């Protein structure tokens, strides 16, 4: 069951949530490889990192030939973004070869860089491929949704975060390992989660990759914090994403295995 199905009748429909996410990730061209990304107010004061990564990827993709799709990216968060101002994305065209293109994006807010992103694009062509084996985890229908898990601990969450935690979302998560938002117990830095959009996405591989980029930051911080016994809402870190060759549409549930190695000098 999705979060919106558990909420009141005044909450947006699942399709409205997904359409809203699509609009949020869309950037507006300003000329000279510059783009504007809109904000979504009503959160906890800062812009969600996955939103900035996804918008930066959309900007980079708009500066590449349409037959080339992103297959990997690296993003570095420099400063926290605020909800009050739009973000400007400046794209640098580093390389265009016979099959590959490389783009860099600097995301700026109020004249200061908040994120750097490097993305590689590949023309679809035959070649060797491999992937990791599917982990041995329960099926999504055998797991509770994240909204249900949040309701069970809502009384332990600081008042200022409760509305943000319980509002309906466009992406539904079903974590394999129980989420402990306020628990400081140390655990290995490995999590598994099933996720999907709560309604169909339009058939657009560029949008599908942007949604994957958006989702990639949703559980990363919590996974990195596990070995240190830290709770959520802390830290800076690097994100990396490899995009596979599959359409998402209404993502049949995808399994995200998220191991984290050495995170650097500090969280």
Which residues fall in each region the model found?
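Terminal targeting signals and extreme-terminal segments of soluble enzymes
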Residues: 2-267
